[in-house]
From Swiss-Prot:
PANTHER family: RRM DOMAIN-CONTAINING PROTEIN, TRNA SELENOCYSTEINE 1-ASSOCIATED PROTEIN 1-RELATED-RELATED
Protein name: Cytotoxic granule-associated RNA binding protein tiar-1
Signal peptide per UniProt: none
Changes seen on gene knockout: Reduced lifespan, impaired stress response, delayed development, reduced brood size and an early behavioral decline with uncoordinated locomotion at 6 days of adulthood. Have smaller brood size and 10% embryonic lethality at 20 degrees Celsius. Produces 2 to 35-fold excess males at 20 and 25 degrees Celsius, probably due to increased X-chromosome non-disjunction during oogenesis. Shows impaired heat-shock response: only a 3-fold increase in phsp-16.2 expression (thermotolerance biomarker) when heat-shocked compared to a 10-fold increase in wild-type animals.
GO cellular component, one term: cytoplasmic stress granule
Native source species: Caenorhabditis elegans
Subcellular locations according to the entry: Cytoplasm; Nucleus; Cytoplasm, Stress granule
Length: 408
């Protein structure tokens, strides 16, 4: 007879259809009545339900077994006569309880498969843990077969993984080849980054790095960060979710996503290498505003980036047109502002007001005029000036500056 065997496959206990005998509502009430810590609100649970036990088990036996995983503070075995005995096991913290859940669920104990789950109210066990102040690790070059579970398992040896997510295309659900792993402790994330970089996961070697600046790091001085969230939020229309990111130099899409992923779901990243900027589009305005407030003049992949609102140019919409990004003058005739518009043929999107550029089927001469105007508008930016100077040297010289009227 086998005393204690590992499980045939991994299972984390959540929504476990084979976890017969477990009743979340009933067992959570019983655990609460016995004085176990279940957690509520921001207080994370640390008590487990352990079911399908042999009738010979004792509280000392269960406590000794689970103490191999973490510090057990309380144990109670329930014998109700009509069903197999079950137990509640409380740990000193959520991380140890989570590790025990993943390690012990479906293990054979006295030839019986243990059923381990959180002893919490229905729905509470699936509530998302707030990882805002946790430490986030970017994982790149993931092979297509790696899912959330495999990602979590690969990084579990380095600490209590609070979240693991493979980023997928919203239309095809296929993996985009990267993901994020979160830890509540800095040293756990640092250890994972150091030891997992270049390791094999699935069919490929992976890259690891910080997903964004680490919580608790000193903020770099920034006059922009002196503005409040409300000020930034109210600077643009209610449906704007586009963030302009300047000074990106040679940053890749992965690196930009790393830097901004912690603020919310990113729906699109468009990069304009020659101009030295990108647009990051979020699925809601709140996430975009937070990104601007916190990331302006912050380090992303070794670059100190500048962040402000992108501006959606609806006047550039054309049937069947694709996204185009560029700079246009505001309708008020004020300073130029970066915007993300809809343009034809993947060229530069139409701007607002008299200084707009865009439209399908533009000729090369018009395109050259556009380049010149972008250069002229941002003549006071030394980095952009150097980029354009290099470009025109390659083109054999800059064209004569056009009048300020728009090009249609």
């Amino acid at each position: 007879m086998s005393f204690f065997n590992p499980p045939a496959n991994s299972n984390h206990g959540y929504n476990d259809d084979v976890n017969t005998g477990y009743n979340a509502r009933m067992h959570s009430k019983l655990a609460e009545r016995e004085g176990f810590h279940l957690g509520n609100g921001s207080d994370e649970p640390r008590t487990l339900y352990v079911g399908n036990l042999d009738s010979t088990v004792t509280e000392d036996f269960i406590a000794t077994l689970f103490n191999q995983i973490g510090s057990v503070t309380k144990t109670k075995v329930i014998f109700d006569g009509s069903n197999d005995p079950y137990a509640f096991v409380e740990f000193s913290d959520h991380g140890q309880a989570s590790q025990a859940l993943q390690t012990m669920n479906k293990r054979l104990l006295l030839d019986r498969e243990m059923k381990v789950n959180w002893a919490v109210e229905p729905g509470q066990q699936q509530s998302k843990i707030d990882t805002t102040r946790h430490f986030h690790v970017f994982v790149g070059d993931l092979s297509s077969e790696v899912d959330n579970q495999k990602l979590r398992e690969a990084f579990q040896p380095f600490g209590d993984v609070s979240d693991a997510k493979v980023i997928r295309d919203t239309n095809t659900t296929k993996s985009k080849g990267y993901g994020f792993v979160s830890y509540p402790k800095r040293e756990e994330a640092e250890r994972a980054i150091e030891q997992m970089n270049g390791q094999w996961l699935g069919r490929r070697t992976i890259r690891t790095n910080w997903a964004t600046r680490k919580p608790g790091d000193q903020e770099k001085p920034s006059h922009y960060n002196e503005k409040s969230y409300d000020e930034i939020y109210n600077q643009t229309s209610g449906d704007n979710t586009s963030v302009y990111v300047g000074n990106i130099a040679s940053l890749t899409e992965d690196e930009i996503r790393q830097g901004f992923a912690s603020f919310g779901r990113i729906t699109e990243v468009r990069i304009f290498k020659m101009q030295g900027y990108a647009f990051v589009k979020f699925d809601n305005k709140d996430a975009a505003a937070k990104a601007i407030v916190q990331m302006n003049n912050q380090d992303v992949g070794g670059q100190l980036v500048r962040c402000s609102w992108g501006k959606t140019g609806d006047t550039g919409k054309t049937p069947g047109g694709s996204y185009g990004y560029g700079y246009g003058n505001s309708s008020s005739g004020g300073n130029s502002q970066p915007y993300s518009g809809y343009g034809g043929g993947g060229a530069y999107g139409g701007g607002q007001g008299g200084g707009g550029h865009g439209g399908p089927g533009q000729q090369q001469s018009n395109a050259n005029s556009q380049y010149w105007q972008y250069y002229a508008q941002y003549y006071n930016n030394p980095q952009l000036m150097q980029q354009w100077s290099n470009y025109w040297q390659q083109q054999g010289g800059a064209p004569q500056q056009q009048n300020s009227g728009g090009h249609q």
